[in-house]
A protein has these predicted regions:
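A short helix-loop-beta-strand connector motif used in the catalytic cores of GNAT acetyltransferases and
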Residues: 38-49, 106, 163
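Hydrophobic, well-ordered beta-alpha structural blocks that scaffold small-molecule cofactor pockets
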Residues: 59-61, 88, 99-103, 110-112
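Conserved beta-strand in the GNAT
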Residues: 49, 55-63, 70-77
Length: 223
């Protein structure tokens, strides 16, 4: 299996990856094909495909923020079972992030991720891909060290239509397992930057940010 970076919408691997995304994720979570042009060309956004016998069987997108020394996993797709794709993607992502933080002269503080709460949503099929079942994924991510940030979370739809997307928890995986809380300012700054690409945001999102500004720290809870 190969771990191949994708930097253009014209890459045939991206066509396959985008089709895989549409099979696996709900429509509001998938950015339109043409809108991927700038993100893929952005050196700070790292999109990799797991390629097996010419097919894209998995993919991951993540980014490193040197100013905060944190990372964000945008998504991880496991499109086929029985190939240890999840382990393959996580291992290669970790190696890449270790090198990026080394270049920054630091060790990674931690990594954010949005994780589905399957206990609060009805549709669990995710394109019928068994490894993508939200119940399974949530437990695996908990095993990896992710913890739930203690506040009710929503995010703007990637359709950029101003709708709020719920049914997820905003989570953080600290490099130091002893950490039980993080600065609210870090969360606010990160979310503001992360969703700055979307011009249409729901009022509920702005309200969430304002409520976070009233906090100094946000607790990390078991996932």
């Amino acid at each position: 299996m190969e771990y191949i970076r994708i930097t253009s919408i014209h890459d045939p691997l991206f066509v396959k990856m985008h089709e895989l995304m549409k099979e696996v994720f709900p429509p509001e979570e998938v950015l339109e094909f043409e809108l991927w042009k700038e993100p893929l060309e952005d050196s700070g956004i790292r999109v990799f495909a797991a390629v097996h016998e010419g097919d894209v069987v998995g993919a991951t997108e993540y980014r490193y923020y040197p100013e905060w020394n944190i990372a964000m996993t945008d998504f991880t797709i496991i499109g086929r079972q029985g190939l240890s794709i999840g382990r393959f993607l996580a291992g290669n992502r970790s190696k890449d992030l270790t090198e990026l933080t080394r270049q920054n002269g630091k060790e990674l503080f931690g990594m954010f991720a949005e994780i589905y709460d399957p206990y609060g949503i009805e549709d669990h099929e995710f394109g019928g891909a068994k490894p993508m079942n939200p119940f399974v994924r949530r437990e695996v991510l908990s095993h990896m060290g992710y913890k739930k940030l203690d506040f009710p979370y929503l995010h703007p739809s990637w359709k950029n239509d101003g709708e709020a997307v719920k049914g997820l928890d905003f989570c953080f995986m600290p490099a130091d397992e002893e950490i039980t809380e993080i600065h609210a300012e870090l969360v606010i700054n990160f979310l503001t930057e992360y969703y700055s690409v979307l011009s249409a945001k729901p009022q509920d999102w702005y309200t969430m940010i304002e409520q976070l500004k009233e906090k100094e720290y946000i607790s990390l809870l078991p996932l």
